[in-house]
Amino acid sequence: MEILEALDATRDETLLYFELGESELAATYGPGKWSVRFLLHHLADSEAVFNERIRKVLCEGRRVLWVYDQDAYARGLDYATMPLSLSRGIYAAMRASLRYLAAGHYERHGHLEWVHSETGVRTLKQEFDKSASHNEHHLAQIRTALGQPPRRR
């Protein structure tokens, strides 16, 4: 399944970046933008949010699910001092869960709908796809911060 390949590819690349040194983790992709460290923490939190949304739709049916404030997470969890090892563990576990859920539910239950508090009606399939594309979007930012060329997938 294409979604599983996308989830695996973005996972494998993301996990490599958790091993960077302090100077690379402090790099940003532009003035006033998040550092690689912040992006990695954000990816872990986003994986948890994607997981919660998908599980709620599978278990509780159509409902309104609220947007999460990524800047509030960065401040409230203090991304600057939060151990990156914690976020690595969260990211790896949440991605394993997402992959498991996608393997069993992407085709069979991908049509199930829910309502995003800002963007409206979405399907489970769209949320799985969003998790992979969101990860890829931030990987592109990390590559830019590190001076790496864009990847062609």
Annotated model-derived regions:
Residues 6-10, 15-20, 74-112, 129:
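Acidic/histidine-rich alpha-helical segments that form the ligand environment
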Residues 24-70, 109-153:
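Short, contiguous alpha-helical
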Residues 1-4:
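N-terminal export signals and maturation junctions of secreted/periplasmic proteins
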